[in-house]
Amino acid sequence: MAKLLALSLSFCFLLLGGCFALREQPQQNECQLERLDALEPDNRIESEGGLIETWNPNNKQFRCAGVALSRATLQRNALRRPYYSNAPQEIFIQQGNGYFGMVFPGCPETFEEPQESEQGEGRRYRDRHQKVNRFREGDIIAVPTGIVFWMYNDQDTPVIAVSLTDIRSSNNQLDQMPRRFYLAGNHEQEFLQYQHQQGGKQEQENEGNNIFSGFKRDYLEDAFNVNRHIVDRLQGRNEDEEKGAIVKVKGGLSIISPPEKQARHQRGSRQEEDEDEEKQPRHQRGSRQEEEEDEDEERQPRHQRRRGEEEEEDKKERGGSQKGKSRRQGDNGLEETVCTAKLRLNIGPSSSPDIYNPEAGRIKTVTSLDLPVLRWLKLSAEHGSLHKNAMFVPHYNLNANSIIYALKGRARLQVVNCNGNTVFDGELEAGRALTVPQNYAVAAKSLSDRFSYVAFKTNDRAGIARLAGTSSVINNLPLDVVAATFNLQRNEARQLKSNNPFKFLVPARESENRASA
């Protein structure tokens, strides 16, 4: 038995450790994009407990980035049935609270019921399973390749989860098409129609079967040591297709979870956001310029002052991995293992921002330095919000493609390619997605009272270079180099370097505020 456990763990490490390899490169000319579009989902699959919407992964800009995008909505007491994918995923919780779980091969069942909780056929049965986690609005959840994942909404507010699948990951040994392997049901695969558009062949006569459907009944009877009736349910025989990938659970699920976490999450993220806004004035000291210049010094005290049992939990679970320090005295010094890896981190409005200007907005990022599991996935993310007429200065992603999904409001974005051509100059509004290829320059200005977005990035340590403002590329060039490069007088070059005192986020001009009032 010990050998089997060791073998399973070795397989799991091989499965996840391979992510250190580079992503596969796009085919020639795939990223020579002369035009970008803000895209809406173009496929919708209804289920008993919600719906799944998908964007076409064959679209040129998604093919350039090597990703697929989908959005799931779960109503109260809705369960997204367990499935696994051929590529790693980042899931952002746009709205709602609930539970999620993953199954890692070889890891122990660390959650169990008390002995008196259930009885059957004269003997006590105690349910045991791997860890179940809570999620809340603003969370990023990392799902490795081939790992079974499920989620459940136990609240009245619908859960909206936006998922990016990195189909160009080196861990995807199939074709460049996202695939979901469901453990139950007989519903339609959400990306199946795009596979047909690409010229793929039908893999089965019935394209809605689950992973058990193709096995003979007697194989499954022997494998599970159960009767044929249970096997028929396992294979989804005679099940209504309308149930779909998201099913309603009558009476709700009974989930083993620490009671203090349940109470904390039942308060919901809205209360946390209200508390966050009440504390905001504490940090609005000094001029707007000082706010940005002192962001590094203020970040740690602000983080410590945040109420946030969730923030404290995140900090404890993340431990010293960000700074290479041990989580606590007496720690054995080992790297966090697959079985105990932290799988989520909150980057939403209730989290402590990395970049903050009270008159312009805020930005929060998560990389593998914050959430080490992202090192396996080779992905990271960014959440930001802009006040009306505030601008995110022109910048570019050093080492990643960026898929920007608008959460709320609308903004005008401009994107420029290597030839100096504008490939996008338009509005990005809530529910739409825009791909910004690596090194393409982009700037954004909010057209709403508050524009918020999440950006998925195809590198676990994605970085940006700013083209304007303090500490930007232009600002860090010698004055004479700037003057000679742009054919400017020295005083003009000095203005170009120093007139914008802000690093990232530029507040609206007073004239713009008056015009919008």
Curated annotation (Swiss-Prot):
Tagged with keyword Transmembrane: no
Molecular function GO terms recorded: nutrient reservoir activity
Cysteine disulfide links: 31-64, 107-339
CDD domains with a match to the protein in the record: cupin_11S_legumin_C (cd02243), cupin_11S_legumin_N (cd02242)
Region (Disordered): 249-335
InterPro entries in the cross-refs: 11S_seedstore_CS, 11S_seedstore_pln, Cupin_1, RmlC-like_jellyroll, RmlC_Cupin_sf, Seed_Storage-Functional
UniProt cross-references to SUPFAM superfamilies, sorted A to Z: RmlC-like cupins (SSF51182)
Quaternary structure and partners: Hexamer; each subunit is composed of an acidic and a basic chain derived from a single precursor and linked by a disulfide bond.
Role according to the record: This protein found in the seeds of many leguminous and non-leguminous plants is the source of sulfur-containing amino acids in seed meals.
Recorded family membership: Belongs to the 11S seed storage protein (globulins) family.
Protein name: Legumin A
Species annotation: Pisum sativum (Garden pea)
